[in-house]
Amino acid sequence: MSAISSALLWKKIRKGLSAGRVQSVATRLVVDRENEIRAFVPQEYWTLDVNLNRAGKPGSFTAHYYGDPQKRELTSEQDVQSVLDALEGQPFSVTGVKKSEKKRTPAPPFITSTLQQEASRKLNMTPRRTMMIAQQLYEGVEISGEGSVGLITYMRTDSLRISEEALAAAGDAIRSRYGAAYYAEPRRYKPKSGAQDAHEAIRPSNVALYPEAVEHDLTKEQYRLYKLIWSRFIASQMTNALYDVTAIEAACGSHVFRATHQSMKFSGFTAIYEEGRDDEQEKLDSPLPDLAPGEALTASGFDKQQHFTQPPARYTEASLVRAMEEKGVGRPSTYATIVATIQDREYVIKKDKRLSPTPLGVVVTDLMIEHFNDVIDVEFTANMEHQLDEVEAGKRNWKAVLREFYKGFHAEMEEAEEALDGKRIKVPDEVSDEVCELCGRQM
C-alpha cells in the first residue's frame, strides 16, 4: 500500500513523498486537530469568588460560586451582576463541612508509549531520542568494575508484566531505602486489552544499581533516562499517597459558594516520583480555617472574572503517541519512527513543542481522505493492526488478510488514477505571522 499510494503522491504533488499506512493516519490526527481548533467557537463564561471572614474570630478564606442552590453556569456579566445584587449586604453562613481522606495510587511501570510521553514531558526528549538512549541502556554500558552491563529490560513493549524476582527486589529496595511504611505488598498490573505481552514492562535490570551509583559511568542523557525508569518502577511498587481533604460550603440565601483544600497526610510513592502532565494542574485553595456548620460569615469582597472556553490543544509528540496508542494505531516498535517521519516528510512541523500540519500535510491528507478514505480511517487502521497481530500469532492466514485488503485498495487506486488523470495538485505557500515591511502582507 505504501509504495503504491506513495507513487501517486509523487506523480500528483511532488517527488519524495510517502503515504505509509500508519504515518498517514498519524498525520490525519494532527490535521483533524487543527481543523477542530479552526472551527472552535469560544464560549463566554464568568467566575465569581467571595472572600469570607469569620465573625469575631481570626481566619478568612476564598470560596467559589457554585449555584443557587443547584450548579449554575454564569455565562454573562449580567448573570454575575444579578447574583451580586442578591448578595449585597446579606450575611453568609457555613452550610456544610466535609472532611475525608483521598488516596492516589502510583502509575504502573513504563511501557514504550508511556516512556516516550514521560521523557518528552520531564526530560524534553523526542520519542526518537528517547528510544535511542534506551537502546544504549538496554544493550549495555561500561560500568566501573562490572564491564558492560545492560541496565534496563527491553524497551519496545506494551506489557505491564513484572517478574517475581523483580517484584521481590523492588520490595527489598523500598524497605531498605524508605522504610517499611512505604511498602505493603507487590503490585501486579493488569495488561491493557490487545497487549502482546512478549516482554516485561520497562524496568531496571538490577534494582540494586541505584541511579547515583552508576551516574559517573553514564552520559547525562543516559543517567537522566535511567533515573526516570528506575524511579518509575520503584514508585509503582510503593504505597499510596494519602491526603486530608476539607470541603466547605457557604451560602447566602439560595446562593452557594464552595472551597476545597487538601494537605498531604502521607507521601507514599510521591517521595520518589510523580507522573508528569500535559495539561495545567488544577489550582488548589489555600488552607481553610476550622469551621463549624451554622457559623456566621461576612463577605469582605468579591472578585468576578471573565473567561472564554479554549480550543483543544495541539498535539505534542508525547500526546500524539498517547493518541496513537489509545486508538490502536501503530505499535511500540513504530511510535517514535512514525512521529519522526511525519516531521521529516514535512507533513507536520513542531513549534513551541506543539505539532501543526504544514500546507503539504493538509493537501496530502485531503487527497488521501478523498481517494483512500478507508485506508486512512483510524478504525480501519486499528483493525488492520489487530489482524496483523493475529497473523503474527498464527491465528490468521497472511495471504487471506492481504487479499481482503488489496481488493478494496486496488479499486480505490484505480478510481483515484482516473479522477486525477492529467491533474497536478498545487501545495499552497505557507504563510507566516511576519509582515513584509514593503507591502504589508504576511510573508
Where are these regions (language model features)?
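Core structural elements
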Residues: 1-6, 22-24, 50-54, 102-114, ...
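Phosphate-backbone binding and catalysis cores of DNA-processing enzymes
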Residues: 1-101, 135, 201-258, 263
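Positively charged, polyanion-binding regions of nucleic-acid-associated proteins
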Residues: 89-105, 117, 301-310
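Glycine-rich phosphate/pyrophosphate-binding loops
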Residues: 126-132, 143, 148-151, 335-338
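Basic, low-complexity terminal or inter-domain segments flanking catalytic cores
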Residues: 39, 76, 80, 98, ...
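Conserved short loop/turn motifs at secondary-structure junctions
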Residues: 13-16, 99-108, 118-125, 153-162, ...
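DNA-recognition alpha helix
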Residues: 114-122, 135-144, 318-326
